[in-house]
Amino acid sequence: MNPARHSNFKAKRVTRNYVQTIQAPPSVVHSLICPVKEAEWLDGWDYSLIFSDSGFAEKGCVFTSRSTGEKDTIWLITKREDATCETNFARITPDSRVAEVTVRAEDGGQQTSRVHITYTITALTEAGNRFIENFTADNFAKDMKFWEATMNHYLETGKALSQSDPEHWLKYESGEEGKK
């Protein structure tokens, strides 16, 4: 069903940006922006690889990720450039939202990277609008800081940091996260 044709639904859209400092060169960071590798450094990452010629991140790679209480999110890698250490994704969470995600690592000097992350999320339904209302700049920054901390921890120790709230994305849907 197309909500725009069958109701007075008006989709909301939000763009959030964040720059991380990761203690590794851009090529190393870029290699970890992969559904398979992410399971090594991000606690609670639950995915299924649907298609990839190499078995890792590449243009055209399709995978799903899951969160309790939501339909699986479908991801498509639309750009994967090793020379610029950039990966672009399109992702759809059925009955909720669609998003464009860009992750680009650049040299930060002294074996570090500045990682530019952009999420542009568009609601498909009222549930998606609720997600966007609660996907505040502060909440996004909190998520990105955890991602930054766990990637740096993994690069130092070979282990992921424990995520205290693996279902945090659901709080955006319900509105709980926006109340904090």
Where are these regions (language model features)?
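Hydrophobic ligand-binding cavity/cleft-lining segments
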Residues: 1-55, 176-180
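Short Pro/Gly-enriched beta-strand edge/turn motifs at strand-loop
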Residues: 1-3, 56-60, 82-88
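Terminal "cap-and-tail" regions of soluble proteins that handle hydrophobic small molecules
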Residues: 2-13, 107-180
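Short, P/G- and charge-enriched loop/turn segments at secondary-structure junctions
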Residues: 4-8, 62-64, 89-91
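Residues that act as N-cap/strand-start positions at coil-to-secondary-structure junctions
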Residues: 14-16, 57-59, 71, 97-99
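Ser/Thr- (and often Asn-) enriched beta-sheet segments in non-cytosolic proteins
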Residues: 15, 19-21, 46, 62-64, ...
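Hydrophobic pocket/interface hotspot
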Residues: 28-33, 39, 63, 77, ...
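Hydrophobic-ligand binding "helix-grip"
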Residues: 40, 67-124
